[in-house]
């Protein structure tokens, strides 16, 4: 099954009607799959009680279930040109994984929403990112299990154009269903090296 996923930082995309939670093994990035990392305009998120966090109004207990905590690997683009990488492990309690299946294309669409910037970039929940921190609540995130290669390279969106039209065109070439993206698509687009066609 071809697994492609768009990772966004916006709760506006999520709703009870079209979001389901799936388990991490179904989304193994290291298993010859590629991912597109796209960031949308951030919106307010609220942290759930317990060890998991979720966007507002995104949980339907009849269809969804919380993921068990597991470690994440984040990739921070530290340069606007060329290839560079910086990885750090995050706790799953800082993020919510919301995914749904596009049966016609046999692809999985996934959303990762970051919690409040004070937690995601602080020294508590997310841990320190060293001397280089992403813009609060907008740092690029690479979803996957611990099997994701340690040195994942991320290229800046500038290589694909900076306008909405160019970025949306790039998503279309990757067969991303644009009906799943809100109209306020903006900010940055990242792609893991090795996922090009």
From Swiss-Prot:
Residue positions with a glycan: 102
Positions of short motif RxLR: 65-68
Signal sequence region: 1-17
Keywords, comma-separated and alphabetical: Glycoprotein, Secreted, Signal, Virulence
Cellular localisation: Secreted; Host chloroplast envelope
Broad class of the protein's primary localization: secreted
GO cellular component terms, semicolon-separated: extracellular region
Described function: Secreted effector that dos not suppress the host cell death induced by cell death-inducing proteins.
UniProt free text on domains: Has the canonical translocation RxLR motif, but lacks the canonical EER motif, which characterizes most oomycete effectors identified so far.
Protein family membership: Belongs to the RxLR effector family.
Name of the protein this chain belongs to: Secreted RxLR effector protein 86
């Amino acid at each position: 099954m071809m697994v492609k996923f768009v990772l966004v930082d916006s709760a506006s995309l999520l709703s009870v009607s079209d979001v389901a939670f799936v388990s991490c093994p179904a989304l193994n990035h290291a298993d010859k799959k590629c991912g597109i990392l796209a960031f949308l305009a951030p919106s307010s998120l609220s942290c759930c009680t317990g060890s998991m966090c979720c966007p507002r109004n995104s949980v339907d207990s009849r269809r969804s279930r919380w993921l068990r905590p597991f470690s994440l690997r984040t990739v921070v683009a530290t340069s606007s040109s060329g290839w560079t990488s910086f990885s750090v492990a995050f706790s799953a309690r800082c993020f919510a994984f919301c995914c749904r299946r596009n049966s016609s294309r046999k692809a999985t669409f996934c959303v990762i929403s970051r919690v409040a910037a004070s937690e995601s970039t602080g020294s508590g929940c997310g841990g320190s990112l060293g001397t280089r921190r992403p813009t609060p609540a907008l740092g690029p995130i690479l979803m996957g299990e611990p099997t994701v290669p340690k040195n994942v390279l991320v290229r800046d969106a500038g290589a694909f154009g900076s306008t909405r039209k160019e970025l949306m065109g790039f998503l279309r070439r990757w067969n991303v269903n644009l009906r799943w993206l809100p109209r306020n698509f903006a900010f940055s687009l990242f792609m893991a090296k090795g996922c090009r066609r």
